[in-house]
Amino acid sequence: MTETITKHERNLSALIHASTFSKFFIPFGNFIIPLVLWTANKKEYEFVDHNGKQALNFQISILLYSILVGMISIPFFLGGFLPNIFDFDNFALSNMHSFNNINFSFDTDDLFGPWMIPVALLGLAQSAIFIVNIIYTILATIKTNEGEVFEYPLTIKFIK
């Protein structure tokens, strides 16, 4: 990218980064709209090609990190709200004759017990991912509109 970058390239690159906010209006808009803009213009403009890859790689990485945090939080969430879910005595053959005696109830005294600590930390991690996504997308939009090359941090290079 040693040649001069035209205003059209800068605007198109900034639009690719800003279009990731379309996820708030269109399901998977943060992938679809940047992908369409990038594929339509990647052969003509090297700067647009670079920024399209950056935006898509960052959005895929953010999705992967969010899924990972969500998967880690499932056992803590289920273990807290449904503490007897892993108690297999209720499903033993010896209890088959007493199916009317099974009582499912929630203990509200221990609703916010120590199991909430990991759930809260994972909730904070999910919030941090969301905030990082917004901040770095805004920074990328501004930097590319100024003609600077922007690299997202903590991005896995899925598209090279």
State what each model feature region is:
Residues 1-6, 98-105:
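Short, amphipathic, aromatic/basic-enriched membrane-interface segments that mark the entry/exit
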Residues 14-31, 57-87, 111-137:
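Hydrophobic alpha-helical transmembrane segments in multi-pass membrane proteins
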Residues 105-111:
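Short acidic, low-complexity segments enriched in Ser/Thr/Gly/Pro
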